Regions:
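Ser/Thr-glycine-rich phosphate-binding loops at phosphate-binding pockets of nucleotides
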Residues: 324, 328-329
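Cys-dependent protein tyrosine phosphatase-like superfamily
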Residues: 21-319, 331-412
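N-terminal signal peptide c-region/cleavage motif recognized by signal peptidases
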Residues: 16-20
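Bacterial N-terminal signal peptides that target proteins for export
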Residues: 1-10
């Protein structure tokens, strides 16, 4: 090697060493446990069951809880260094699944919606140097996930079921609607008053007659047209998109969704021909009956269709939802979690987590959900899981089907 080449080689080596010497991983500390929930979300999640209902009584605690919504707290990865670009990679351990692989020009990057109670490896590299560290996500339910544009999004996984086995994470997600409901146009308050003046309001069906009686007794109408519920034009276009193209691509990459179980009515899904997540996702449109309605003859037939989707391994990962992710979605989640052996208290916790976005935080919702749980308890069996199995057998599934579903969704 001649002198000039040798000097060049040494300079390059020194530059690489300088990058290495100046990179310092700052946070999280190696081996640290990180949180993915806001403080008030954590307080609710870890509170004794007897204290949980204070968060859903319409008081200040409930308002504070709703102020944070259902968004997860991102894990912030920080380091020191003066390189112009870094490659940051985050892997789930021990399987090594990559959840982030990104080139950045800053000294910080955020990652969210990680599996709970899981060890993660993160690396930062610049030039030929690579520094490695590890952290663990807190064992705190629920696993909130981000789908920017929708809300009330979470993994049903992580909860413990039969034999203390966790429900597998990353297989079944419950959310609010992936697009808006089909629009409905309502008569304004002024238009309703004109209809009453013309003698036409009482001829406009049940809602028109009810509004007519209100006006005759001197009761005031709501200033919000939707609350008066007199339909002028019903479902005339598909619901608006909630996701950008970029967010759809991210959702598919991060969560790998293959199937979308849409529990909304035909009217709500007017004009839709597929999932808002695109053609790679199979859309199962199954109009659902919530709460006690799930146990009627019609409800049983509907449940057979819904849970038939869960029995096909090719359909996973699955997202299921209605529009708010509370009533119909909550009933499906309750039946599935009960079958997997989740304790009743934890099933209630999952349902009431929807209070993070201000739904179900009132007595009527809780009564309706309680009535559905009571209906399930009418089935034979010693435990709630036994009763859920009897319910699934009533739907027409076999014991082998039940066992196969449990093995698919519970960790070994």
């Amino acid at each position: 090697m001649n002198g000039n080449r040798f000097v060049g080689f040494c300079a390059a080596a020194l530059a690489a060493w300088t990058v290495s010497a100046q990179i310092e991983l700052v946070a999280p500390a190696d081996g640290a446990t990180v949180r993915q929930m806001h403080t008030i979300q954590r307080e609710y999640a870890k509170a004794p069951w007897a204290q949980c209902e204070k968060y859903f009584d319409g008081a200040e605690n409930s308002k504070k809880l709703r102020s944070r919504g259902s968004t997860p707290v991102p894990v912030k990865l920080q380091w020191k260094g003066d390189a112009t670009e870094y490659q940051v990679t985050v892997r789930r351990m021990p399987d090594g699944k990559v959840v982030l692989d990104q080139a950045v020009a800053t000294n910080c990057v955020e990652v969210d919606s990680l599996d709970i109670a899981t060890e993660w490896e993160w690396t930062v590299s610049a030039g030929s140097d690579k520094l490695v560290s590890h952290f663990k996500t807190e064992d705190r339910l629920p696993r909130l996930v981000r789908m920017t544009g929708s809300n009330n999004c979470r993994d049903i996984g992580g909860r413990r079921g039969l034999g203390g086995r966790r429900i597998r994470q990353g297989l079944v997600y419950r959310t609010a609607g992936l697009n808006s409901n089909a629009p409905v146009e309502y008569y304004s308050t002024d238009e309703i008053l004109e209809l009453e003046k013309a003698g036409k309001l009482k001829e406009m069906g049940h809602t028109g007659r009810a509004l007519h009686r209100k006006l005759k007794t001197g009761e005031k109408l709501s200033s919000h047209a939707k609350k008066n519920r007199l339909v002028k034009r019903k479902c005339f276009a598909p619901g608006k998109r909630r996701f950008t193209d970029e967010e759809v691509a991210r959702i598919l990459k991060v969560y790998g969704i293959r199937s979308d179980i849409d529990l909304r009515s035909d009217d709500e899904c007017y004009g839709m021909t597929g999932s808002p997540l695109g053609p790679t996702v199979t859309w199962f449109h199954i109009s659902y009956r919530a709460y006690s309605g799930a146990f009627t003859e019609e409800g049983l037939a509907i449940n057979k269709k819904v849970f038939g989707v869960f029995l096909d391994d090719a359909n996973y990962p699955i997202v299921f939802h209605c529009i708010g992710g509370a009533d119909r979605t909550g009933t499906v989640a309750m039946l599935l979690e009960a079958l997997l052996g989740v304790p009743e208290e934890e099933i209630w916790r999952d349902y009431l987590t929807t209070g993070f976005v201000g739904v179900v935080s009132d007595p009527p919702h809780k009564k309706s959900f309680g009535d559905a749980v009571k209906k399930l308890k009418e089935y034979p069996g010693e435990t709630l899981a036994d009763k859920a199995e009897a319910f699934f057998l009533k739907l027409g599934f076999t014991k082998d089907d039940v066992q196969r579903l449990r093995e698919r969704l519970l960790e070994r």
